[in-house]
């Protein structure tokens, strides 16, 4: 009687472990799918892939520009901010090009090197942009990214999704997938040895 209870408890534990392993594998596959349709397209779309050295030629704050709080919005709620324009000398080609913060900056406003968030306080934004401009004048040489294919003649300061960041994004689903597969394999091995011991 005790042996039957032990066998029943063992089978329940194996079933739960197997469900856990399958659940981890399923969750990891969903995470892979989510990353594949959200982050990977942005990474492959970016053409600024080669790192080089940029030297600041001029960093000026132009007249205030504006951006709407949402694309296609008919509201008159418009956010104004100083337009910072940074021009640099691209070491790789010797050209004078405009610097943008990230790939997203160019899409949001190609006239400005930095675009703040819409919900930020205007005074804080003005102070931050002035600080950024002074930092560019203080630190005139820094690494930047350019398009080796020549499709984009401008450069960016940092990539939204660099290769290391993309690998780190895939790390957690990979660990979950590996752990789930390991649990399933261990359960199957346990079941195999249980069958062998039952035959003896």
Swiss-Prot record:
- The positions flagged as glycosylation sites are 89
- Main localization of the protein described in the UniProt heading: membrane
UniProt keyword Metal-binding present: no
Membrane topology listed for this record: Multi-pass membrane protein
Q: Which residues form the signal peptide?
A: none
- The residue ranges crossing the membrane are 20-40, 167-187
Q: Which residues lie toward the Extracellular compartment? A: 41-166
Q: Which UniProt keywords apply?
A: Glycoprotein, Ion channel, Ion transport, Membrane, Transmembrane, Transmembrane helix, Transport
Q: Name one GO biological process term.
A: detection of calcium ion
Q: In this UniProt entry, which residues form the Cytoplasmic topological domain(s)?
A: 1-19, 188-200
One GO cellular component this record assigns the protein to is: voltage-gated potassium channel complex
Family per UniProt?
Belongs to the KCNMB (TC 8.A.14.1) family. KCNMB1 subfamily.
Q: What is this protein called?
A: Putative calcium-activated potassium channel subunit beta
According to its UniProt entry, this protein's organism is Coturnix japonica
Name of the encoding gene: KCNMB1
């Amino acid at each position: 009687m005790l042996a039957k209870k032990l066998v029943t408890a063992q089978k329940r534990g194996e079933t739960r472990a197997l469900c856990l392993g399958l659940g981890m594998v399923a969750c990891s596959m969903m995470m892979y799918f989510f990353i594949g349709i959200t982050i990977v397209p942005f990474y492959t779309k970016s053409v600024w892939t080669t790192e080089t050295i940029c030297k600041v030629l001029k960093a000026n704050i132009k007249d205030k520009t504006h951006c709407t709080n949402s694309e296609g919005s008919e509201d008159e709620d418009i956010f104004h901010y100083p337009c910072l324009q940074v021009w640099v000398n691209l070491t790789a080609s010797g050209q004078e090009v405009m610097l943008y913060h990230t790939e997203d900056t160019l899409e949001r406003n190609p006239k400005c090197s930095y675009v703040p968030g819409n919900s930020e306080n205007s005074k804080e934004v003005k102070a931050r942009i002035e600080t950024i401009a002074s930092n560019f004048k203080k630190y005139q040489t820094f690494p930047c990214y350019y398009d080796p294919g020549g499709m984009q003649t401008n450069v960016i300061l940092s990539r939204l999704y660099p290769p290391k960041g993309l690998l780190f994004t895939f790390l957690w689903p990979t660990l979950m997938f590996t752990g789930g597969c390991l649990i399933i394999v261990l359960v199957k091995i346990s079941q195999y040895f249980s069958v062998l011991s039952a035959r003896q």
